[in-house]
Design a protein with these regions (language model features):
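Positively charged n-region of N-terminal signal peptides that target proteins for export
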Residues: 1-6
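Hydrophobic membrane-insertion alpha-helices, especially the h-region
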Residues: 7-22
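Cleft-lining beta-strand/loop regions that shape enzyme active-site pockets
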Residues: 22-34, 38, 42-55, 78, ...
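Extended, small/polar residue-biased N-terminal targeting/export presequences
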Residues: 49-110, 154-176, 181-186, 523-528, ...
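Short linear motifs in exposed loops
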Residues: 111, 140, 173, 334, ...
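Polar, glycine-rich mid-to-C-terminal structural blocks
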Residues: 292, 304, 311, 315-377, ...
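Conserved functional hotspot residues or short segments at active or partner-binding sites
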Residues: 345-352, 356-548
Length: 548
């Protein structure tokens, strides 16, 4: 019987072989054909197109559009951008540690990093950069200025700056250092029992930084912890696995990857002894939490190891691998999808069903599949991680949004910082009434204009009324509504004073105490953090949410 089965199997294999060979041959022929057509097309363009063609620019445009048709993450990286990839992987570069922006022809500092040569030399947010190493910056692009400020560690840089509102003109002599972006931006105790760790990246060393923060907090007496991954775009897969391993036993499978090539089919498990497998954990996420952030949140949810709080995550469940190309260029391509312990894939079903910020739109349950966590709770695939407790995101009024967009908060904080040497510590600083009263005049001096959401809606209504021939009959009513909803700066500043004051206080604090200070100022007003503390303080509710 076995011999007959083997014979039948061999016959079937022999019959299928020509079909497999033909399919492979057709595929190879199609590739060869298309490459030949492309080469012929480029030759004709070079010979006969009416204007001179930059071959590098043309080919780059073609490559970018070709890869864009696959997914948003498969990218061609020319030699000139290799440093960007190294920065994304290591979080390190040689430079002075300052971000810059541009208004018209003016280059200005948006943020000097805490502890960087820029910060130690006295460079401030809002400072106008006039020269770098004696060379004027006017009319040049920010990317060019940024590259000029980067360089070999230990080499000098001279900046000539102008300080707004104070009239100072300064020459700062700096020495480039290794700039390392921390993955743990901030950590502290929230209550006597609850710690807080904000993780903003997954570059090399992220898991070590989280371990060190957790151990320090445990020494301070915490018995629960909040992990904040909001706004974290992800990074290295292994760092995500190691962060999970801090809270999960050795040997636990964390994630599997599945790709077309056998080499991309793999399983990643916890390899070390954990720090604490019992400490209650709350994981904070939002629509900008992506990739490695989603692995950590998803695994903690699948294993019922922590409560997830916030908004649905971005929905990026793809693995990218960097491959070497000719002339030192590289290709960052999608090689696999990752799957977490329940068996679900976090990747959004398609790239078109997304909101303007890139996050996942509404996906009907009929298009997704149901999975179960370790404790039997129901979870779904196809669109990021849905939190156990959903919190509405912080939103701003049209007035405050326009103030952010036009950098009015930034400029007001710049003026305040350059006229005031010190303020109270983060969490204790509050905007004084005299400072608030300066704001309307400041906005008017800066020619600030805005339109309320109601005004925008009314304008659209007017166009519809006009197109349908109703405007003449309703003109009086429309004008009455317009008088009510039109922006009145003094009125609207008072109406939205609480939120505007909060944003101003956060921006001003960051000028004295940097991003760690901003975090300490933000925390008392953060509803998502408050909810996490509430849940972690109630063991019965915490365990109920985990299905235990």
């Amino acid at each position: 019987m076995r011999r007959k089965l083997k014979t039948v199997g061999l016959i079937l294999l022999l019959l299928a072989a020509p079909l497999i060979f033909t399919a492979q041959h057709d595929r190879e022929f199609e590739w060869s054909k298309q490459l030949d057509i492309q080469q012929s097309l480029l030759r004709e363009l070079d010979l006969y197109y009416v204007d001179e063609i930059d071959p590098g620019k043309l080919i780059r445009s073609g490559i970018d559009h070709m890869l864009k048709s696959l997914d948003p993450y498969t990218l061609y990286i020319p030699e000139s951008r290799i440093e960007d990839i190294q920065l994304m992987t290591t979080g390190e570069y040689g430079g002075i540690g300052a971000m810059i922006g541009q208004r018209g022809d003016t280059i200005f500092v948006t943020e000097p990093y805490e502890g960087s040569p820029a910060q130690k030399a006295g460079l401030r947010a809002g400072d106008l950069i006039r020269q770098v190493n004696g060379r004027p910056v006017s009319g040049r692009k920010p990317a060019e200025i940024t590259e000029e400020m980067k360089g070999e560690i230990g080499s000098p840089v001279t900046l000539t700056i102008e300080r707004p509102y104070s009239g100072e003109k300064l020459t700062l002599n700096l020495v480039r250092e290794k700039i390392k972006f921390p993955n743990v931006a901030h950590y502290q105790t929230l209550t006597d029992n609850t710690g807080y760790i904000r993780i903003t990246g997954f570059t090399e060393g992220a898991s070590r930084e989280v371990k060190e923060a957790l151990l320090d907090l445990k020494e301070q007496g915490i018995s629960s912890v909040v992990l904040d991954f909001r706004g974290n775009p992800g990074g290295l897969l292994m760092e995500a696995v190691e962060i999970v391993n801090i809270f999960v036993p050795r040997g636990q499978e964390v994630v599997t990857t599945r790709g077309k090539a056998r080499q991309w089919v793999a399983s990643y498990s916890c390899r070390s002894n954990p720090i604490d497998t019992l400490i209650p954990v709350a994981v904070l996420v939002n629509s900008a939490s992506a990739s490695a952030s989603e692995i950590v949140a998803g695994v903690m949810q699948d294993l019922d190891r922590g409560v997830i709080i916030g908004q649905r995550t971005f929905g990026k469940g793809l693995v990218q691998t960097t491959r070497n190309l000719s002339y030192k260029a590289k290709l960052n391509l999608t090689t696999a999808k990752y799957y977490i312990p329940s068996g679900r894939c976090i990747q959004a079903l398609d790239y078109s069903n997304r909101r303007p910020d890139g996050s996942v739109g509404n996906i009907p349950d009929s298009l997704t599949s149901e999975f179960s966590t370790k404790a039997g709770r129901k979870v779904r695939d196809g669109g990021g991680i849905i939190p156990d407790i959903q919190i509405k995101p912080r939103t701003l009024s049209a007035l405050a949004t326009e103030m952010v967009y036009q950098r009015q908060f930034f400029d007001f904080a710049t003026k305040f910082r350059n006229l005031n040497e010190s303020i109270l510590p983060p969490g204790s600083f509050h905007l004084q009434e005299t400072v608030w009263k300066d704001l309307p005049a400041f906005l008017k001096e800066n020619n600030f204009t805005y339109q309320t959401a109601s005004e925008e809606a009314l304008e659209k209504l007017e166009k519809v009324l006009e197109s349908e021939k109703f405007l003449d009959k309703s003109a009086e009513l429309v004008n009455q509504i317009k008088q009510v909803v039109s922006g009145d700066l003094n009125r609207d500043l008072e109406l939205f004073r609480p939120e505007i004051t909060t944003v101003l206080e956060e921006e001003i604090v960051s000028r004295y105490y940097h991003q760690s200070g901003r975090a300490r100022q933000v925390i008392p007003n953060d509803q998502t953090i408050a909810k996490a503390v509430e849940i972690l303080s109630n063991q019965e509710e915490y365990l109920k949410l985990l299905g235990k």
